[in-house]
Amino acid sequence: MGRKWANIVAKKTAKDGANSKVYAKFGVEIYVAAKKGDPDPETNSALKFVIDRAKQAQVPKHIIDKAIDKAKGNTDETFVEGRYEGFGPNGSMIIVDTLTSNVNRTAANVRSAFGKNGGNMGASGSVSFMFDKKGVVVFAGDDADAIFELLLEADVEVDDVEAEDGTITIYTAPTDLHKAIVALKESGIQEFNVTELEMIPQSEVSLEGDDLATFEKLYDALEDDEDVQKIYTNVDGF
């Protein structure tokens, strides 16, 4: 599973212009977290969590600082979280999380992306019941048993710990993700590849040929929208 997360990160950053879009989306997320609380990450755990994730995505420091400075200013720009669910070809399912200053624009854009790229929008809950929300932590290591014991001693609710190709992948209860990160840092682990709240599919589908091409087109159209923060899917490799 460690390889899976590495492949997903590589795929997301391989597209031309992908980095600038990732930076912009993290800029919005950092601004919102800083605006909701103290703009100091040392006293605002939600902001620190977003900044840590931004650093994992190699977002430059000046982008992070600019978003925090904007939150410190007098701007009253507000952003609203949203979730959309839908279907692609041959049993594929998609959850789209958004963060937007214009809900009507975002809803229209997401609906258009589905409609023009071989997908269908679904009602709220039509897809998400087939996914489980989990905390995911990925870092270099090979002793899954030792990590499992460490987390149990820290009273972390652990769903699974996997070791593959020199990488440890941990799945936790969503409410225990922060606790897991703290326990790992206290044990001396300081570098993380992934620290995310994810929607994990209960089962995956593999697509080939035209179905895969259609799905990639749909996925890219959604990912290219500036208001789309995260996409979850049951398609293997995404």
Swiss-Prot record:
<keyword id="KW-0805">Transcription regulation</keyword>
<dbReference type="InterPro" id="IPR029072">
    <property type="entry name" value="YebC-like"/>
</dbReference>
<keyword id="KW-0804">Transcription</keyword>
<comment type="similarity">
    <text>Belongs to the TACO1 family. YeeN subfamily.</text>
</comment>
<dbReference type="Pfam" id="PF01709">
    <property type="entry name" value="Transcrip_reg"/>
</dbReference>
<dbReference type="InterPro" id="IPR026564">
    <property type="entry name" value="Transcrip_reg_TACO1-like_dom3"/>
</dbReference>
<dbReference type="InterPro" id="IPR002876">
    <property type="entry name" value="Transcrip_reg_TACO1-like"/>
</dbReference>
<keyword id="KW-0963">Cytoplasm</keyword>
<dbReference type="Pfam" id="PF20772">
    <property type="entry name" value="TACO1_YebC_N"/>
</dbReference>
<dbReference type="InterPro" id="IPR026562">
    <property type="entry name" value="Transcrip_reg_TACO1_YeeN"/>
</dbReference>
<dbReference type="InterPro" id="IPR017856">
    <property type="entry name" value="Integrase-like_N"/>
</dbReference>
<dbReference type="InterPro" id="IPR049083">
    <property type="entry name" value="TACO1_YebC_N"/>
</dbReference>
<dbReference type="GO" id="GO:0003677">
    <property type="term" value="F:DNA binding"/>
</dbReference>
<dbReference type="InterPro" id="IPR048300">
    <property type="entry name" value="TACO1_YebC-like_2nd/3rd_dom"/>
</dbReference>
<protein>
    <recommendedName>
        <fullName>Probable transcriptional regulatory protein SSU05_0402</fullName>
    </recommendedName>
</protein>
<keyword id="KW-0238">DNA-binding</keyword>
<dbReference type="GO" id="GO:0006355">
    <property type="term" value="P:regulation of DNA-templated transcription"/>
</dbReference>
<dbReference type="GO" id="GO:0005829">
    <property type="term" value="C:cytosol"/>
</dbReference>
